[in-house]
Amino acid sequence: METWSVDQVCKWLVEKNLGELVPRFQEEEVSGATLLALNDRMVQQLVKKIGHQAVLMDFIKKYKQGNQELKPTGGPADTSTLTPAQAAPEHEQNPSPTSHGDQTSLYPAVLDNRLIDQRVLKQRRNVKHVLARHKALQWTKSYILPEFPYDVKCMLVEQKRPDHSMRIRIIEFLQADMTKYLEGSLYPTTQQYNDVVNALLQAHPFLDEDGCGFFLWKRALKDRFKYIRRPIEDDEQVMRNKCKFGHRRGQTRKSLADIQSNEIKIVQIKEESAHLDSEVDEHISWFQQEYMKTERDWREVDKRMSQTLEIRRKMIGGQTPLKDILKMFPFLKCPYQMFREVQILTKTDIYKKTRHILESYSENILTAFSVLDNPINTALQEKMKHYTDEGVLKSPEVLKNMKMTATCLLLPHVFGDEPSLFVVVNGKVHVSTPVLEVKNPFHINGCEFSLYLNKEKLTKVDDCVTALAALVSAFRVFGIECPRRLSQTFNFLETLIFDMQSPQFPSLKEKEIRSQPPIT
């Protein structure tokens, strides 16, 4: 490895399922000698993800140990004949005594001409595989927690309840440690998840919150591995495994030929887009110029957006970066154009349907048992009382808008989803998927709604109906998959908006209207 070139190092990274690191290693011109000279701090600067850091350092450490443990051969004459065996680590050449005894009883290890029998080498490789598997099984029964950072250890010693960021740090270190023990594998078994979480809760029982801590920590650990696995979804070996074992239960398995056919279609779409650039270039230039004007010709905008719909859908389906899409078609930032695109694609007036949902389900959601003590509901009650005392709530339309705003903000709470993936109230956006930002939600004149995409403000809207319709439209128009922790809320909305099936509204049987005076 010391004599490897940069290309050889990159090839080795791909073989070790670390192909994501190749561009960075090429940029820094990391050769074999440089790779072996890396220390922990250098690896942290070179590799972003903590899981990849752990795997890379473990591979380097094992190589150095194996290199030091290699024993010199008897003489120069034997060097050429023993080269294949010397290339392997010592434990591969010298398995356990029992295994070695079995091998010598089957085949002579060394022939008369001092050459190693290839059948023996094959048996030794098989023994290595069995030993590695046995080692993994042993690990699952006696897992030892890693050495946590100083601040995490202080929190554990003081038995403080960890906040969200501290939970993430603990999970990251557990995931990195498991990956190291699993020799780079990102697919632990259920038993291995159980053993790790059990070890954590046995060492620190206060983390088991109300007896439900085991399932919460296990789910968080599983989600962390899913997040780490995302960058390798397009890896050739991963695609082969999906093809072999099936990606989802009940899903039709795709052959490798089908996968390659899909890849060819994507390439064809991109090539077709390139050829059509000359035809749509005039439209794109016009869009960019018209978007900068204060008074726009909306009839012409609608006409040209319809003419470029096909190429736009192909580009979005071909995974063209959203920044490029929005640069070429800036009017997609306008809620009206997003609603129009949804109407063309689904034959649905999304604004009208969204308004109907907020009006129809407002009372049910605001009186649902799961949100009675929610801070948003409490803030609504206080503002309504304040405005009533001042005589501001004379218009029924103002009261109706306040209730619909609260309904919009409470949707993920009612369905048990993650609210920060849906709306951020008086805070900062931290997610890349479409999300709403709301400032001063119940202020009659100072309430502000904005739609964010990739942590950047896409557009500012006037009211909660437009905001919610724009949020649902953004996922549809830009082909973005809904986050799993928001699936229940979006299933409810899309079911009603696109008339897919009758939705199941949770917690209506649990609501206790008598525990809170009705909103009038």
Curated annotation (Swiss-Prot):
Q: Known InterPro entries for this protein? A: SAM (IPR001660), SAM/pointed_sf (IPR013761), SAMD3 (IPR042812), SAMD3_SAM (IPR042813)
- Origin species: Mus musculus (Mouse)
Polar residues composition bias: residue spans: 94-104
PROSITE patterns documented for this protein: SAM_DOMAIN (PS50105)
Q: Where is the SAM domain?
A: 4-71
Which residue intervals make up region (Disordered)?
A: 67-104
Top-level taxonomic group: Eukaryota
Question: What protein am I looking at?
Answer: Sterile alpha motif domain-containing protein 3
